[in-house]
Structure formats: C-alpha cells, structure tokens
Amino acid sequence: MHLAQLRQPLTRAAANSCHSVCRLPTTHSSVSATAILSEQFAHLRIGPSSSNVAVEGRRYASVKAQGAYRLKPKRTIPKKLGAKKTGDQYVIPGNIIYKQRGTLWHPGENTIMGRDHTIHAAVAGYVKYYRDPQLHPDRQYIGVVFNRNDKLPYPKDAPRKRKLGLVAVPRKVEEVEKPTMSASGLPLFVTRHETIEIPPPAVTTPAAAGKAVKGQGARVSASGAAAVPASSSTISASASSNSNNGGSSVIAELIKEKLAARAEYNARQSALRKLQQQKMLARRGTRVLRLMNNYSYRETNWEIGRLIGDPGSVPGTEKVGSRKAKFRARRRRRNTFLLGIKERKLAKADRREEYRRRVREKREQRLVQRKEFLAKQREAKKAREGGAAAEKSEKKEVKAEKPAAAAPKVEKPKAPEAAKKESKPKVEEKKAAAAEPKKDSKTEKKD
C-alpha cells in the first residue's frame, strides 16, 4: 500500500490520540500515563484486525492472474530467439546454444535438437559453427568439440573422439623372453630338419650352349615350355636350304643362337622348379618335438594334422606358389595386356598422324607444281601473243609499201533467213493479185 493512501488514516489516529492525552489529569501517577499511551499507540498497529480497516484502505487488481501470457512450446517470444552461445564459448551438457523457429541451424558434432528446434549441448566443450559439404551441400551445423583448437568437420575416416575421463598414456610393452629350458634342465622343444643338398649353379657360356645344341640338338614348341630333341641334320638342312634359296649363313647362325637360348632358359626353369620342390619337401619334413609332462618328446596334434595339407587339398597335387603369387602373376599379365593395347593405340595414332602428314605434303607439292605449270602457260601465252602482234605489224608495213589493186565487188550470198523474209512479201503480193480479178468478175455479174 502506498503512503499516499495511508496519509488520512494516520492523521486521524494521531489526532485522536493527542486529544485523549491532553485530557489526562495531572494528579495521576506516571505509571497510569504510560499505560494510556500504550493503549493509544496500539490503535495504530496495521494488521488483519477489524480496528485497522481504515488504515489498510481499498485494494484494486493491477495485473491479470498468473498464466495469462502462457505460450505454446514452439511459439517462443521473438525477442528471445537467436544464438545464446558464441563460437569457442565453453558449454556444459544441457546448455542452450541456439533458439530458433524452424531449422536455420542443424545439430552437428556432440549436439542435440529439442522439440522446438532448440539446439542443446550434449557434452562439455567448446561451441563451433561450421559447414559440412560432404554431409549436406547447403546446411549449416553447430557442434561442440573437446579441444578448443579442433576444427569441424572432422575428416571422414578419422577415429571418433570421445571423452571417457581417462588420460592418454603410452603403453609400455615388455617383451618377455620365452623359456627354452624346463625346470629340470631339459629343452622344451627339439627341431629335426631334413637336410637337402643344393647343387651349385652351373655357369654356361654362349659358346658351350651353342656346342651343346649343335651336338644334341633341340627343338622348342610354339609355347616354349617343352623341348623336343632334334638332330643336327635338321638344323643344317634348314640352314643349307636357306642358303640355297638366296639366304645367307647369318640366318642359320641366328636360328642356332635362338635355339641355344631357349634350351638354356628351359634348363634353368626346370632346375628352379626342382629346387622349389625340394625346399617344400624339406619344410614339410621338418618336425618340432615338444617336451610332454611324462618327459617324452612328441609332435602336437595340430602339427600332425598339418602334415596332410590344408582342408580340401591332397598333398603333392597342388601347384608350387601361393595364392597371392597367382594373383600377382594374373595382375602382371593383365597389365602387360593392357599396356600392349595402349601401345598399339599409340602406334596407330602415330601412323595416322604420319599418313596425314604425308597427305598434306603431297597436297602442298601438287599445289606448287600446279602454280609452276600455270606460270609456264601464262609465259607461253604471252610469248605467242607477242609473236602474233609482231607478224601483224610486219604485214601492215608490207601492205603500206605495196598497195593492192582494186578488186571487183562480188556479191555475197544472202543468208537463208534474209531470203525467207524477202520471199514472204512476194507471196503476199501474188495472193493479192490473184484475188483482184475475182472481185471484178463478181461485180460484173451483179451489174
């Protein structure tokens, strides 16, 4: 209640109290006077009692009841929309970062969206406003990062960052040495190797290879895999036939060198295959005997099972080489094939360009020849015209020196068209002359 409303009730109460105090007789003691004053001031107490109605005054409603300004959850007051946290500002889980109508901003890393499209922080960290073209070309996102220096978006294949409340400590891996001896002093395992003798590689010279081929002879098939023995008579016969047919002895020597190289290559490949087979057998023949509880040595069950090979394969029937080696060989063949196609295309393009170049050169050459020919023709024509003009001038000079006698005039024969034109009027005249006597005869008869 305002003081202005309490002014009149207070003045009235004070006036009544003073009036009663002034009437007090002087004969009373001080105790009775204090009691009277306390009674008078009791009337001034403001409270719910009926005696203070005049002091309280009237009450009027100034605002509406609570709940009159209640809005829907999605219809926030416009003045309260917008960003609540700026970039790089620290937030805790549940903090409102951006309040909006619709999705102007979308939730990104470590953020969530409420029912009214408000974006909240899901973890404690620093706010980042960013775009992610890989996720969406036009959307803009709000995220929260743990480290202030981090940048969003994170790389696509990067590991996800989580805050587990732990500290990254490098792991110390201590390599424990595996024991090789038992407590009783016996070795824990014994390895038995199958020894093989690897012959030293034979060094062959081209001359020795040529002699071997000349003595024994070899004929390689088209595939180059199998070598078929052939007598030296066939080689000499082929060489002699080539020489008899106009060839030279160089061709025969080239054939011999090629056959020798093929034989040497096949021998080297067969030796390599044998060595690989021996190594594989030695690897299979190696036995690892382990110490058992009864102080006996034996192979483990899984090693015994490996002796028969992998599941679904029979030992001794598989080809030498691993599965990945086959894949590498296939890839190498494919690359060689594709490289050959590319080289053929390039060669074809070069041939086409060479052909076009030759065509252009021939065209230019023909144009030059044509220009030369036309120039020669013009020169010849000018020469002929100059000779004709000289002859005419000479003739004129001769005529001027010797004037010719007057020749009799000879009538030229008329052209057939002129004769026809002259004949037409003559025919008309004849018709008119024939028609005149007929008219005269008719007139005479009438008379």
From Swiss-Prot:
Subcellular location: Mitochondrion
Chief place of localization: mitochondrion
A Pfam short name: Ribosomal_L27
Keywords: Mitochondrion, Ribonucleoprotein, Ribosomal protein
Presence of keyword Ribonucleoprotein: yes
Region feature Disordered, mapped onto this chain: 377-447
GO BP term (any one): translation
Signal sequence range: none
Annotated TM spans: none
InterPro entries registered for this protein in UniProt: Ribosomal_bL27
Entry keyword annotation includes Ribonucleoprotein: yes
GO annotations of cellular component type: mitochondrial large ribosomal subunit
Bias (Basic and acidic residues) ranges: 377-402, 409-447
GO-annotated molecular function: structural constituent of ribosome
SUPFAM superfamilies, per the entry: Ribosomal L27 protein-like (SSF110324)
Domain of life assignment: Eukaryota
PANTHER family: LARGE RIBOSOMAL SUBUNIT PROTEIN BL27M, RIBOSOMAL PROTEIN L27
Record's function text: Component of the mitochondrial ribosome (mitoribosome), a dedicated translation machinery responsible for the synthesis of mitochondrial genome-encoded proteins, including at least some of the essential transmembrane subunits of the mitochondrial respiratory chain. The mitoribosomes are attached to the mitochondrial inner membrane and translation products are cotranslationally integrated into the membrane.
Family to which this protein belongs: Belongs to the bacterial ribosomal protein bL27 family.
Complex and partners: Component of the mitochondrial large ribosomal subunit (mt-LSU). Mature N.crassa 74S mitochondrial ribosomes consist of a small (37S) and a large (54S) subunit. The 37S small subunit contains a 16S ribosomal RNA (16S mt-rRNA) and 32 different proteins. The 54S large subunit contains a 23S rRNA (23S mt-rRNA) and 42 different proteins.
Name listed for the protein in its UniProt record: Large ribosomal subunit protein bL27m
